[in-house]
Amino acid sequence: MLRAAWRALSSIRTQAVTQPPVLGLPGGGCAKLLSVQRDLPSSLILQAARGYATQKPVQQSQEDDPPPSMLLKDYQNVPGIEKVDDVVKRLISLEMANKKEMLKIKKEQLMSKVVENPKDTSSLEAQIVALTVKIRSYEEHMQKHQKDKAHKRYLLMSIDKRQKMLKNLRKTNYPVFEKTCKELGIEYTFPPPYHRKIHRRLATKKALCIRVFQEVQKLKKQKRALKTAAAAAQKQGQRNPESPSEARSEAIKETQ
């Protein structure tokens, strides 16, 4: 009995070694022994089997981002700020600032590059700068939370709005448009021309509409002819009284 059990176990091991490679594993790896698979943690086996081990590259920060050691705007002009301890400087720097303050500083930096008057917020180029900062913030958020449908919708809506503003700025002031695109590092793409594919249903519907229009015009013309004939017959009846049916038949013959 023991010898038979040992032979069965040895045959199972030889089958596991000579097993062909499994196509589901990434990299075309071969199936290992059951003992080796048991030694591995279950999370690694699931990741390899389901293909979840691949990670997307994280988006790098923009070149125009301020350094994290930069102080906040409210503390930059404070006298004696250079003598403050490093821990305090870190607390009032951009490294510990919230998202709203970071976006505000990025917006001010881009405004100083693009807009002549930094306090101007109503011009097209200023609105484009504000939308660009918002779009980059949405892109960073989408890199971390790829299933956030609400922010994805906000991102697409902001891109469409900026595209429309760039189109208007290009029509009104082309030099400012070039400067804005160059400083912000964006590229304006022309919208595709409208093209509707002609098919049999559309052609048949158009022909039917033309035919109906012609028939309606023909009926209107006949009604006008009958009215004029009736008016003429009424005038003649006052002079020479006749039956109205005979006058109407004569008018129809004249129109035909």
Curated annotation (Swiss-Prot):
Organism, as annotated = Bos taurus (Bovine)
Name one cellular component (GO) term. mitochondrial small ribosomal subunit
List, alphabetically, the Gene3D superfamilies matched.
S15/NS1, RNA-binding
Q: Which GO terms describe its molecular function?
A: structural constituent of ribosome
| UniProt similarity note | Belongs to the universal ribosomal protein uS15 family.
Name the record gives this protein: Small ribosomal subunit protein uS15m
Q: Where is this region: Disordered?
A: 226-256
- Composition-biased stretches (Low complexity): 227-239
- Alphabetically, which GO biological process terms does the record hold? mitochondrial translation
